[in-house]
Amino acid sequence: METTWLHSMVQGDETQYYRKRDGIMVEHMVRPANFDMRYNHFHQEYEIYLLLRGKRQMFFENRAYEACAGNLILVDSGQIHMSHSLPGDPEPEYERIILYVDKAIVEQADKIFPELKIGAFFHKHYGIYELTPEETEQTRFYAMQEDLNYLIDNLK
């Protein structure tokens, strides 16, 4: 089943990269730092969010957490979440890469590799993780974009 992805673009949004195929979507975007999501939302996709520049206030299940550049954010399928600007953030914009993976793909992976328990991992370990500067090097993610393009192009 193919998911329809809806995005409300705001003035100042600059999409650096966008690719969607067969239940996997990669989005690299630069947005004004003062961008605030208006509503809590949820979706059936699992979300892996890397904040490359700037700061964000992330809300999971009505609890607020601060995320800064280099943080990896995991969002469970169906989890209520939202992102807001941080008051006093001197950065004019923030930059992030998000990988969305359809729930059906994770369920299929869990059947093929039951020892990994990917869905259960997201359910138990959602939240914000600090990575080292080496782990967040942009070049690694740009290389990953190329790898994902290759995988997406050769899935079928």
Where are these regions (language model features)?
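Generic hydrophobic, helix-prone segments enriched in Leu/Val/Ile
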Residues: 1, 9, 65, 121-124, ...
